[in-house]
Regions:
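Walker A (P-loop) phosphate-binding motif
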Residues: 17-84
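Charged, amphipathic alpha-helical linker segments immediately N-terminal to NTP-binding catalytic cores
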Residues: 1-11
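Phosphate/Mg2+-binding loops and adjacent switch elements
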Residues: 70-73, 77-192
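Generic beta-strand or strand-like secondary-structure segments
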Residues: 7, 48-56, 97, 115
Length: 192
């Protein structure tokens, strides 16, 4: 019953991606941006991957910073810097976890472009990682990493509202890396 709406949603998503990339595609930041996201709704393991990358990049001499939407936090205004001694109710639990565990600067804000600009203006970062920003096309990016839950994969393969996908499976062919989190189901090889 929702299948016809899925076609509308998928078409609007493609049009939105095309428009935002055309409008904002030429902009760059003073540091490269690595976006870690997914094409399905729900938990896929993005934050643990981001945290592992932050730690490895620091060992290799990089000075990473992180931007996040701050889902679950009360803050709804312009971007703010996460205080590692602050409360998850303000920033969201994942940004606070990243700030505490990785000891790196984290900025939360719904507008990721503004969050990146604030991060780079206030900290000596030479690399930015965006937690769950794959569909935030107004934010220029250098590298895209899509995380897929190996046990759930893509559900029924349909986009919202008929299925769990934010974008079609074909979107994975445009990202730089696909990371599979957890054991892969038997149907994965033919899909991937």
């Amino acid at each position: 019953m929702l299948r016809p709406l899925e076609f509308v949603y998928r078409g609007l998503s493609k049009l939105r991606r095309w428009f935002l990339r055309r409008r904002f595609g030429g902009r760059q930041y003073a540091a490269p941006v690595i976006v870690i996201g997914n094409i399905a709704v729900g938990v896929s393991g993005k934050t643990p991957l981001l945290m592992a990358l932050v730690m490895q990049l620091r060992l290799r001499g990089f000075k990473p910073g992180v931007v996040s939407h701050g889902y679950g936090g009360e803050h709804r205004g312009p971007p703010i810097i996460v205080d590692s001694e602050g409360a998850a109710s303000i920033y969201g639990d994942k940004p606070l976890l990243i700030a505490r565990q990785c000891a790196c600067p984290v900025v939360v804000g719904a507008n990721r472009d503004h969050a990146v600009r604030m991060l780079l203006a206030n900290f000596d970062c030479n690399l930015v990682l965006s937690d769950d920003g794959l569909q935030h096309y107004a934010m220029p990016r250098t590298v895209e990493v899509a995380v897929v839950d190996g046990s759930r994969l893509f559900g029924n393969g349909y986009c919202l509202p008929a299925g769990p996908l934010r974008e079609s499976i074909a979107r994975l062919s445009t990202v730089d890396f696909v990371a599979i989190n957890g054991p892969i189901t038997d149907s994965a090889p033919e899909i991937l």
